[in-house]
Every structure is written in C-alpha cells, then in structure tokens.
Regions:
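Hydrophobic alpha-helical transmembrane segments of membrane transport and translocation systems
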Residues: 100-102, 107-192
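Cytosolic regulatory modules rich in charged/polar residues
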Residues: 1-51, 121, 162-189
C-alpha cells in the first residue's frame, strides 16, 4: 500500500508541478476565470515586475541556489542554502521585486522537483513548464493549450532507450503493464 501511494503521489506531484505556474499565470491574465472560492490565489499586491518575469527569474534563482549548495562544503551546504533562500525570499518580497504568491508557488515547484526519480526527469518537467509559461505569456489561452500539445507530442513521439514511447503503457495501451506501473505489487515468493 505504501509503495502504491508513493508511486501515485509522485505522478500527481509531477502533473501539479507542470501545470501549477502556467495555470496561475493564465488565471492572473484572465481573473474572471478564477473559480468561486479560489479568489485567494489572485495577486493582491502591486505588481512591479510582470508575473512572467518573476516566474522566470525565480526558476533561474532556484537553479543558482542548487548550484551554490552543490559547490559548498557538505557541512555548510544545507544550513547555508536554507538561510540564503529565506533571506533572499524575504528581501525580494519586501522590496517589491516578487509577490508573495509567486514565491509560494515557485517554492512548491522547487521542492516538488525533488520528488522525481531522476534529476533528468525533474529538469525535463522544468523545461517543458518554462516553454508553457513563455507561450502562455505571449499567446494567452492558445499558448497554454499549445504548451500542453507540445508536451503531449514530445511524450508521444520521443523514444526511450528501449525504443518505446514515453507514454507506454498508455500508448500503445497495455493494461497489465499499466497496472504494474501505477500499483506496486508484492514480489513473488522465492522458489524452493
């Protein structure tokens, strides 16, 4: 049960990580689309820097903090990176560079990237998210939809090392294999 829960939560977090910031940007451009009861997600403070630039700068800043943590001696890396993130985050919100909502969503995305199995998968999601952000900022709804289409086409037509689609076992559909991918099963008992 625990293994299945972790697999499903990892998949859900990957999906949320991809959609969170582009959807937020789209809803800030079209605030009338924010569902009732979710008005709290709207940016209330004055926006000095356009939201797209805030999101892109924070994507870059998060990578800068990761690189700084990698190049810092082990004993100092965790406390130093936490302190840097707190101080820089607090200063950037108080000075008006970034809005607190943007900082919150990007903090979630940054932490959620560590839930993926591999570093490459985390960066693949990041690059596709950035493409979707830029397309949404330029073309609005059509850019948002276009970013999703680009992701779907990339997943469908790029091949893994085993020459299967990244969407396998969904495309082509293989029900038993899909069950194994989503739900962790017990290993067969050792034969005597």
């Amino acid at each position: 049960i625990t293994g299945t829960y972790l697999r499903l939560s990892r998949l859900l977090i990957a999906i949320v990580t991809y959609f969170l910031t582009p959807t937020f940007l789209l809803l800030m451009e079209y605030p009338q689309w924010i569902p009732k009861g979710f008005e709290f997600i709207a940016v209330r403070d004055t926006v000095y820097i356009p939201l797209i630039w805030q999101l892109l700068l924070l994507e870059l800043a998060i990578d800068g903090l990761k690189l700084a943590a990698v190049n810092t001696p082990n004993m100092l890396s965790t406390p130093l990176s936490v302190m840097a993130a707190l101080v820089l985050g607090e200063f950037s919100v108080k000075s008006g560079w970034f809005n607190s909502e943007v900082m919150l969503y990007m903090a979630f995305v940054a932490v959620a990237n560590y839930t993926q199995n591999s570093l490459e998968l985390g960066y693949a999601l990041k690059f596709m998210r950035i493409i979707n952000l830029v397309l949404t900022a330029i073309f609005g709804v059509w850019g948002y939809v276009g970013g999703i289409v680009i992701l779907a086409v990339s997943l469908l037509f790029n091949r893994t090392v085993s020459s299967r689609s990244y969407l396998y076992p969904l495309v082509p559909f293989h029900g038993k294999q899909l069950g194994h991918q989503l739900f962790r099963t017990r290993l067969p008992a050792a034969r005597k």
